Amino acid sequence: MENNPSSKIEVAVSSRFLDQQSNRNEGRYVFAYTIRIYNAGNVPARLIARHWQITDANGKVEYVTGEGVIGEQPRLRPGEEFRYTSGVVLGTEQGQMQGHYDMMADDGTEFTATISPFVLSVPRTLH
């Protein structure tokens, strides 16, 4: 996979703790995250697959891969964005996610869009 300036995807993430869906007594902490994928390049591109690395506060790592996101493989023209919200369940009050998307430009060129690490944290627990 190659990366070049014409194929530039920006990814922004926000996360929040879902207290009502969590059960602290059972060590079940539910988080939602919203992703904004923006095509900052000058060629249309389609999101083909996702690759996540999810790490809890104990260092337990889970890898998740799959086609597209939320059942879609969105195609973004230059200047377009796609937003979606998904969720994750951790066994600890804090954790982290990071990963990348496999992308394909209209000309068939494959490239990677990086998802920088972001924090998952129950409010008032981050030190």
UniProtKB/Swiss-Prot annotation:
<dbReference type="InterPro" id="IPR036767">
    <property type="entry name" value="ApaG_sf"/>
</dbReference>
<protein>
    <recommendedName>
        <fullName>Protein ApaG</fullName>
    </recommendedName>
</protein>
<dbReference type="InterPro" id="IPR023065">
    <property type="entry name" value="Uncharacterised_ApaG"/>
</dbReference>
<dbReference type="Pfam" id="PF04379">
    <property type="entry name" value="DUF525"/>
</dbReference>
<dbReference type="GO" id="GO:0070987">
    <property type="term" value="P:error-free translesion synthesis"/>
</dbReference>
<dbReference type="InterPro" id="IPR007474">
    <property type="entry name" value="ApaG_domain"/>
</dbReference>
<feature type="domain" description="ApaG">
    <location>
        <begin position="3"/>
        <end position="127"/>
    </location>
</feature>
